[in-house]
UniProtKB/Swiss-Prot annotation:
Assigned protein family: Belongs to the RxLR effector family.
Purpose of the protein: Multifunctional effector that can suppress host BAK1/SERK3-mediated immunity through at least two different pathways. Manipulates plant immunity by targeting and stabilizing host E3 ligase CMPG1. Preventing the normal 26S proteasome-dependent degradation of potato CMPG1, and thus potentially of its protein substrates in the host cell, further abolishes host cell death during the biotrophic phase of infection. Also associates with the dynamin-related protein 2 (DRP2), a plant GTPase involved in immune receptor-mediated endocytosis.
Domain-level remarks: The RxLR-dEER motif is required for the delivery of the effector to the host cell cytoplasm but does not bind phosphatidylinositol monophosphates. The motif is cleaved after the RxLR sequence. The RxLR motif (residues 44 to 47) plays a crucial role in the intracellular processing before secretion. The Glu-rich part localized just after the cleavage site (residues 48 to 59) is required for homodimerization. The conserved, positively charged effector domain (residues 77 to 147), rather than the RXLR domain, is required for binding to phosphatidylinositol monophosphates (PIPs). PIP binding is necessary for accumulation of CMPG1 and Avr3a in host plants.
Site positions for Cleavage: R47, K48
Record InterPro entries: RXLR
Entry keyword annotation includes Disulfide bond: no
Organism encoding this protein: Phytophthora infestans
GO cellular component terms listed in the entry, alphabetical order: extracellular region; host cell endosome
Name this protein carries in UniProt: RxLR effector protein Avr3a
Region (Effector domain): 77-147
Residue numbers carrying N6-acetyllysine: K48
Amino acid sequence: MRLAIMLSATAVAINFATCSAIDQTKVLVYGTPAHYIHDSAGRRLLRKNEENEETSEERAPNFNLANLNEEMFNVAALTKRADAKKLAKQLMGNDKLADAAYIWWQHNRVTLDQIDTFLKLASRKTQGAKYNQIYNSYMMHLGLTGY
């Protein structure tokens, strides 16, 4: 009898301590005064962008989705290793191009097996392991992962 009372009292105390700790963290997170946030802290490491577009550094080439050739992403039609490798390298180097490819593949119902065959053709030595990022990103695009 005494053990049951001690266990229930312990459970109540733990519940009370947990609930009060959660309320305090909400106050700390939502109640941060604005004067503690420094405006320059978030921008300290960023470089100033130059206004002249010709001299500013380009991180990625200009990309226009309207100019894409539909046959470019057709992995089923790729039979030459050089073409497959070229497309895989382009997809690895340009996120916008990769996103466009994922959308095109999803629209044309390209299966993961076809993507795997394409990647194995692109890198025969590693059996496609070199381009796992493309395969995994396409899986995430399709929503087949736990994220």
